[in-house]
Swiss-Prot record:
One of the record's GO cellular component terms: cytoplasm
Species classification: Bacteria, Bacillati, Bacillota, Clostridia, Moorellales
Superkingdom to which the source organism belongs: Bacteria
Keyword Phosphoprotein (UniProt): no
Name of this protein: Elongation factor G
Keywords from the named record: Cytoplasm, Elongation factor, GTP-binding, Nucleotide-binding, Protein biosynthesis
Span of domain tr-type G: 8-282
Name of the gene: fusA
Molecular function, one GO term: GTP binding
Length: 692
């Protein structure tokens, strides 16, 4: 079957935003106007098409990014709806990795909120071209221009409005199109009929000022346009659009539009902007990768004629078809029923069926082409971030990095019968979500689950009950402490056993030293002259890592250490991998005790929005939680307090803040960094752990 839409007419985009900016509503309206949905879904009613997991409909937030295909002006648009809640940054990170462009939705009242900053930084990391859509122009306190200013100041971007709102709050009627210089009014309830009229007289000066800014930005993107502009010639709408497209794709400019998705105003021009300004797969650079056989760098261009290469970016358990693997095809084509090579795992797998997803219904397709986003049924071994490719031309695409979980809870099944079901279910959930981990605590035998925040773990427990019918009891949340060392130390590990026949002999001398925070573990082998045979070196490394899983202070994992194997000895007969593994482990434990071990705790970036009269009280409370207040700023009749607070002090904060501010305060927090726990508190934690 030939491809329906040429690559140039394909757009792979994400819709990203803060939690309440109206992202899901905007996506719903896009699906309505592009004809995929016959009745608009409302998040308020809990029936939005994209939010198809039951938990999402109840909570009114988007948790998993559903991929949907729709059509506008003879273009195919694949949309990935991403969650805006900080506990789900992994979903955002995954979807940005496979997108070519994005629409950032902002609330006209809140402007740039903390989650918008996080998502924006993630998009910067992957160099994703963006257009901004300032939504909720009908709300009290709507301020388009403040939104634009905040995009520049807080995100360090170059926002250039290509529309200006006509009116605001309840008098918001439409917008001025600065490219074609006309006013657009919405006349019917559903927003399907647009009236074009001359620009209102009272807006002429403002329009002129912003038209000038737009022309300047466009001229800067292209030398020919710059010459034309400087010579005072009029630029045609086509030239302006071409200039905006060029600057947007080069991530030198962010075109800004406005609207009110809920009131059905502004969505069609947004669709036009997606088609006009966001890149096709052919506009973005070739995807980089590595040839797994030679280790050489390699790349794949967006073309059906190159060897097949795709990235699996999401795994979902589907009640009807089993495991669904969402993937983005970067090059080549893939037929259903064919075999692919998973180069990350070095395994060959068979693709059963290929599905194109529309929020929660699906159509089966025979073949996926370069630039497509689709879901495969039948891949057993593939997990998030794996590369699928042609076995004759293997390539490993750069995988994604996911943040470490910061919060853990002990979980136990309500009945004996649930025990086995629970571990299978948790295993499946961990496959879907790389920021969710499960392990068994060696000392207590409890099952511990860890994730990115309280909401994240709540939803996991909720899914256990609904999808897997496993009842579970959850303990109190625990902080994921870590340990590290503060000074370099040399130590020796000897494991010698003489029993009848073969004995055991392993002897190593290692040096350990602190690495800078976040650098992780590094093993360096400096053995020369074969004092320890080559085949035993990996065993020493494994032994050290095993010892690092349980630190010397309180049994927490040790991080940011470089271990160097400098010397040792072996025995012709008695040495074995096992003996060297134990020697490595003993050496590390001994070294860590002498290397000034310290306890680290996760510190969160917290942003609290409260009415003025509660500000003093809330700041006092943050200080009492060992918080450092970094700054404050007024926002729409309230105060925004930014602070860094240890996670250990933030449990139950939501309830506390509600009672302190009579339900008027809100807050968001996300992981920022690890830092050393103050001595007196560290002693308490250690004695509790040892007492347990």
């Amino acid at each position: 079957m030939a491809r329906e839409y040429p690559l140039e007419k394909t757009r792979n985009i994400g819709i990203m935003a803060h939690i309440d900016a109206g992202k899901t509503t905007t996506t719903e309206r896009i699906l309505f106007y592009t004809g995929r949905v016959h009745r608009m879904g409302e998040v308020h009613d809990g029936n939005a098409t994209m939010d198809w997991m039951i938990q999402e409909q109840e909570r009114g937030i988007t948790i998993t990014s559903a991929a949907t295909t729709c059509f506008w002006r003879n273009h195919r648009i694949n949309i990935i709806d991403t969650p805006g809640h900080v506990d789900f940054t992994v979903e955002v990170e995954r979807s940005l990795r496979v997108l070519d462009g994005a629409v950032a939705v902002f609330c006209s009242v809140g402007g740039v909120e903390p989650q918008s900053e996080t998502v924006w930084r993630q998009a910067d990391k992957y160099g994703v071209p963006r257009i901004a859509y300032i939504n909720k122009m009908d709300r009290v306190g709507a301020d388009f221009f403040r939104g634009v200013r905040m995009i520049a100041e807080r995100l360090g971007a170059n926002p250039v409005p290509i529309q200006l709102p006509i009116g605001a709050e309840d008098s918001f009627q439409g917008m001025v199109d600065l490219i074609n210089m006309k006013a657009i009014y919405y006349t019917d309830e559903l927003g399907t009929t647009l009236d074009e009229e001359p620009i209102p007289a009272e807006m002429e000066d403002l329009v002129q000022e912003y038209r000038e800014k737009l022309l300047e930005a466009v001229a800067e993107s292209d030398e020919e346009l710059m010459i034309k502009y400087l010579e005072g010639e009029e630029l045609t709408p086509e030239e302006i659009k071409a200039g905006i497209r060029k600057a947007t794709i080069a991530v030198k400019m962010v075109p800004v539009l406005c609207g009110s998705s809920f009131k059905n105003k502004g969505v069609q021009p947004l669709l036009d902007a997606i088609v006009d300004f966001l890149p096709a797969p052919t506009d973005v650079p070739a995807i980089q990768g590595v040839d797994p056989e030679t280790g050489d760098e390699d790349e794949r261009h967006s073309s059906d004629n190159e060897p097949f290469a795709a990235l699996a970016f999401k795994i979902m358990a589907d009640p009807y078809v089993g495991k669904l693997t969402f993937f983005r095809v970067y090059s080549g084509t893939l037929k259903s029923g064919s075999y692919v090579y998973n180069s990350t795992k070095g395994r060959r797998e068979r693709i059963g069926r290929i599905l194109r997803m529309h929020a929660n219904h699906r159509e089966e397709i025979d073949e996926a082409y370069a630039g497509d986003i689709a879901a495969a049924v039948g891949l057993k071994e593939t997990t998030t971030g794996d590369t699928l490719c042609d076995e004759q031309h293997p390539i490993v695409l750069e995988a994604m990095e996911f943040p470490e979980p910061v919060i853990s809870v002990a979980i136990e099944p309500k009945t004996k019968a649930d025990q086995e079901k629970m571990s299978i279910a948790l295993q499946k959930l961990a496959e879907e979500d790389p920021t969710f981990r499960m392990y068994t605590d060696q000392e207590t035998g409890q099952t511990i689950i860890s994730g990115m925040g309280e909401l994240h773990l709540e939803i996991i427990v909720d899914r256990l009950l609904r999808e897997f019918k496993v009842g579970a009891k959850v303990g109190r949340p625990q902080v994921a402490y870590k340990e590290t060392i503060r000074r370099p130390v040399k130590a020796e590990g000897k494991f010698i056993r003489q029993t009848g026949g073969h004995g055991q002999y392993g002897h190593v001398i290692i040096e350990i030293e602190p690495q800078e925070p976040g650098k992780g573990y590094e093993f360096v082998n400096k053995i020369v002259g074969g004092v320890i045979p080559k085949e035993y070196i990996p065993a020493v490394d494994a032994g050290i890592q095993e010892a690092m899983a349980n630190g010397v202070l309180a049994g927490y994992p040790v991080v940011d250490v470089r271990a160097t194997l400098v010397d040792g000895s072996y025995h012709e007969v008695d040495s074995s991998e096992m003996a060297f593994k134990i020697a490595g482990s003993l050496a590390f434990k001994d070294a860590a005790k002498k290397a000034q071990p310290v306890l680290l705790e996760p510190v969160m970036r917290v942003e609290v929005v409260v009415p003025d009269e509660y500000m003093g009280d809330v700041i006092g409370d943050l200080n009492s939680r060992r918080g450092r207040v970094e700054g404050m700023e007024p926002r729409a009749g309230a105060q925004v307090i930014r602070a860094h607070v240890p996670l250990a002090e933030m449990f139950g904060y939501a309830t506390d803040l509600r009672s302190r501010t009579q339900g008027r305060g809100t807050y968001v927090m996300q992981f920022d960094h690890y830092e050393e726990v103050p001595k007196n508190i560290a002693e308490e934690i250690i004695s509790k752990r040892q007492g347990a």
